[in-house]
Amino acid sequence: MTTSGQPTDRQHLHDELERVRADLRDLVAHAGPADLRRRTDGTRWTNGQLLWHMAFGFLIVRRLLPLVRLFGRLPDRFGRRFAAVLEAATRPFHTVNYLGSVGGALVFHGPRLPAQLDRTIAQLHRRLDAEPEATLGRRMHFPVGWDPFFHDTMTLAEVYAYGIAHYDFHRTQLTLEQS
């Protein structure tokens, strides 16, 4: 259930995941070497590094799902403490987040990048289809200092949508010729 008590619109999430998959594939296919080396608007990354970071957001979603399932079953205080511990590590997290995208772009570029996203989104589709509706309403606390799209608490359904919002936000920062 969504926070409004309505069933989760799974088809909308599926459609949005497919939109992202097609968009990244198109961006990578049309970006030349000079495009990928160009700085982005509002980040310290190049376009190539930001493209990896955008795809990596969906890998993060895959790792967050079991955490939300687990903490969604535990008393609220456990999730609140876990989020507080993560929040205390916000500064090192931002450094690792930045450097991880610098390094990730060295490995995942060209056709490897959309192939990785294809595999990840296919896994997210399968998981979303398998989630019982009650599980989609489970929630946990998040370290809000880590990402502007993290909220104090998020449901499993909101975590699926997080990757899409993260992607769309960063897409506006690309400085590719056709973006």
Q: What label would you give each PLM region?
A:
Residues 20-36, 171:
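Short, Lys/Arg-rich amphipathic segments at extreme N-termini
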Residues 90-96:
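Histidine-centered catalytic/metal-coordination loop motif
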Residues 1-18:
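Extreme N-terminal tail/first-helix region
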Residues 17, 21-24, 117, 121-124, ...:
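Hydrophobic alpha-helical core bundles mediating ligand binding, dimerization, or RNAP-core interactions
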Residues 38-90, 122, 129-130, 134-179:
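Short, contiguous alpha-helical
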